[in-house]
C-alpha cells in the first residue's frame, strides 16, 4: 500500500484517471479540428461558387400564369417561367382585385379617369327634381367636417367620370354636374352676411354619382332635411325610375357646407345658444349655486301625463322607478359645495363638447338626466328643422318632445339600464325624431353616451343621430 499523501502535496493520479483524461483531451481536439475545417470550408471561394444560389427577387405584380399557379414571378415580360413553358404570347400582368366600392364602376371609366383630364358634363337634367325656392351656391368647397370633405372628394374622384373641383358659374343654369356637392359650399347661415354668390336653378342639388343631396340656403328660408325628405318622397311618386336607378348605386346621403369666411360654425337664426359660458374662468366665477333638478322632473312628469295614455305611462313609470330613488339617495349625501361643483363640472364638460361637436359634423344634442335640453348642434337643427332658439330658451324643452311615442318608452327603458348598471353608458339604438313639420318623421340610428360626474352620478346624455 502506498503511503498516504502528505498535507500540501498533490495526490498521485491513478492509471484509470489518466485514461479518462486522455480520452477527454482527444474528444476536445477532434471537435476543435472539425470546427476549424467547417469554417475553412465555408470561407473557401470554390465552395461558395458551387453552393451559393441567387435569391429570386419578389416582383410587385406577377403574370397571369404565375399568379394562377401561386409561383414566384419576375419583372420581365415574358417571364422566365413562361418562356420555359412556351407561354410567351399570353404572359401579361395579372389583374388586381378591385375594391368593393369600385365593383359597380365600369373599367372603361376608370381608365378614362386615369389618363384624361376631367371636364364638366351634366349627366341628369335638373327638371327631373322637385323645385325648391331660390337655392344659392357659393364658391368655397369645404364641409363642416374636414374629414368628410376629404372623403367625399376622394370618392367622387374615383366614382365620377366627369369631375372638376370648381364648376364654371356660367354652366350652372344648364344642369347639375356630378361634383356639385363637392364644389359649392352651401350654408344654412343667415342672410345678413355678405358674400359672393351666384344663383343656381330652383331645384334640389344632387350628386348623381354619390346619390348625395345638398342641404343649403334659400331666399325664403333654410332648406333643411325634412324639406328634402318631402321632396324625395314626391320624386318617388313622379319619377320612380330616377330614384330606383340612384338607389342601385348607393344609399342616399346629405351634405352641408359653411360660409366662405373660414368659420366652421354655422350661425342659425335666433342667435348663438351653444353655451352660456365662453371660457372656463367664467364657469368657476359665475356658477355659485347648485342646479335644481326638481322642477325639471316635475315638468317632465307633467308633460308625459298630458301626452301619453295610461298604459304607456305605466311602462315609463316602472322605468323611472328603477333609477329615480338612486338619484335622490346619492344627492342627499352631498353638501351644497358638492352640488355647486357638480354644476361646474357639467358646464365645463359642456364647454369642451361644444368645440368637439362643431368639428364633428354629426347631428348632436345634449340633455340633462331630467331630459332638459342643454345643448343643440347646428347639424341637429338642419336634420330636424327645429330652430335652435326654440329648443334652448328660458323655458326648458325636453328631449322626449322630439321623439315619437315608441321611442320615448324605449328611451326610459334604456336609460334605466345604463343609469347605474353600465359605467360607460354608451349604447347604440334606433329612434324616430319628430321634425318641425307635423307630417314628417325621421327614423335615425343614434348613439347615446352617458357622462358621469366625479361622484358617479349620471350628469348628461350626448345623443348623436344619423338618418337611416
Swiss-Prot record:
Where does the PAS domain start and stop, copy by copy? 349-422
Biological process (GO) annotations held by this record are: carbon catabolite activation of transcription; carbon catabolite repression of transcription; cellular response to starvation; gluconeogenesis; positive regulation of gluconeogenesis; positive regulation of transcription by RNA polymerase II
Q: Might you report a single GO cellular component term?
A: nucleus
The entry's DNA-binding region: 63-91
GO MF term set: DNA-binding transcription repressor activity, RNA polymerase II-specific; RNA polymerase II transcription regulatory region sequence-specific DNA binding; zinc ion binding
Location within or outside the cell: Nucleus
Could you list this entry's UniProt keywords, alphabetically sorted.
Activator, DNA-binding, Gluconeogenesis, Metal-binding, Nucleus, Transcription, Transcription regulation, Zinc
Q: Which InterPro entries match?
A: ERT1_acuK_gluconeogen_tf, PAS, PAS_13, Zn2-C6_fun-type_DNA-bd_sf, Zn2Cys6_DnaBD
Pfam families membership: PAS_13, Zn_clus
Task: Family membership, please give it.
Answer: Belongs to the ERT1/acuK family.
Q: Which PANTHER family match?
A: TRANSCRIPTION ACTIVATOR OF GLUCONEOGENESIS ERT1, ZN(II)2CYS6 TRANSCRIPTION FACTOR (EUROFUNG)-RELATED
Q: What does this protein do?
A: Transcription factor which regulates nonfermentable carbon utilization. Activator of gluconeogenetic genes.
Q: What is this protein called?
A: Transcription activator of gluconeogenesis ERT1
Amino acid at each position: 500500500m502506498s503511503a498516504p499523501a502528505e498535507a500540501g502535496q498533490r495526490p498521485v493520479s491513478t492509471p484509470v484517471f489518466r485514461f479518462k483524461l486522455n480520452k477527454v483531451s482527444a474528444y476536445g481536439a477532434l471537435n476543435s479540428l472539425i470546427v476549424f475545417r467547417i469554417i475553412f470550408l465555408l470561407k473557401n471561394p470554390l465552395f461558395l461558387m458551387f453552393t451559393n444560389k441567387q435569391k429570386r427577387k419578389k416582383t410587385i405584380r406577377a403574370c397571369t400564369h404565375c399568379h394562377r399557379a401561386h409561383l414566384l414571378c419576375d419583372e420581365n415580360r415574358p417571364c422566365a417561367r413562361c418562356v420555359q413553358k412556351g407561354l410567351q404570347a399570353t404572359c401579361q400582368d395579372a389583374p388586381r382585385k378591385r375594391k368593393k366600392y369600385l365593383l359597380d364602376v365600369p373599367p372603361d371609366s376608370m381608365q378614362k379617369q386615369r389618363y384624361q383630364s376631367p371636364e364638366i358634363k351634366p349627366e341628369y337634367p335638373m327638371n327631373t327634381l322637385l323645385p325648391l325656392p331660390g337655392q344659392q351656391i357659393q364658391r368655397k368647397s369645404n364641409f363642416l367636417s374636414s374629414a368628410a370633405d376629404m372623403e367625399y372628394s376622394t370618392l367622387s374622384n374615383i366614382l365620377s367620370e366627369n369631375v372638376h373641383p370648381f364648376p364654371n358659374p356660367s354652366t350652372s343654369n344648364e344642369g347639375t354636374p356630378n361634383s356639385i356637392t363637392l364644389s359649392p359650399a352651401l350654408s344654412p347661415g343667415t342672410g345678413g352676411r355678405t358674400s359672393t354668390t351666384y344663383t343656381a336653378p330652383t331645384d334640389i342639388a344632387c350628386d348623381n354619382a354619390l346619390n348625395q343631396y345638398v342641404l343649403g340656403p334659400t331666399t325664403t328660408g333654410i332648406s333643411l332635411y325634412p324639406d328634402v325628405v318631402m321632396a324625395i318622397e314626391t320624386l318617388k311618386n313622379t319619377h320612380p325610375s330616377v330614384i330606383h336607378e340612384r338607389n342601385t348605386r348607393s344609399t342616399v346621403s346629405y351634405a352641408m357646407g359653411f360660409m366662405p369666411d373660414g368659420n366652421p360654425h354655422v350661425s342659425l337664426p335666433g342667435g348663438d345658444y351653444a353655451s352660456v359660458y365662453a371660457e372656463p374662468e367664467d364657469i368657476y366665477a359665475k356658477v355659485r349655486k347648485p342646479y335644481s333638478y326638481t322642477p325639471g322632473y316635475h315638468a317632465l312628469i307633467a308633460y308625459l301625463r298630458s301626452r301619453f295614455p295610461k298604459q304607456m305611462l305605466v311602462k315609463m313609470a316602472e322605468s323611472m322607478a328603477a333609477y329615480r330613488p338612486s338619484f335622490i339617495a346619492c344627492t342627499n349625501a352631498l353638501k351644497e359645495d358638492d352640488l355647486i361643483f357638480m354644476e361646474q363640472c357639467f358646464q365645463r364638460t359642456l364647454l369642451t363638447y361644444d368645440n368637439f361637436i362643431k368639428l364633428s359634423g354629426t347631428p348632436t344634442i345634449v340633455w340633462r338626466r331630467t331630459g332638459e335640453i342643454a345643448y343643440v348642434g347646428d347639424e341637429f337643427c338642419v336634420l330636424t328643422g327645429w330652430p335652435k332658439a326654440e329648443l334652448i330658451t328660458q323655458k326648458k324643452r325636453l328631449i322626449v318632445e322630439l321623439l315619437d311615442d315608441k321611442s320615448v318608452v324605449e328611451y326610459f327603458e334604456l336609460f334605466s339600464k345604463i343609469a347605474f348598471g353600465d359605467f360607460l353608458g354608451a349604447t347604440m339604438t334606433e329612434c324616430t325624431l319628430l321634425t318641425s313639420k307635423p307630417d314628417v318623421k325621421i327614423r335615425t340610428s343614434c348613439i347615446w353616451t352617458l357622462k358621469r360626474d366625479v361622484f358617479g352620478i349620471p350628469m348628461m346624455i350626448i345623443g348623436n343621430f344619423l338618418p337611416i
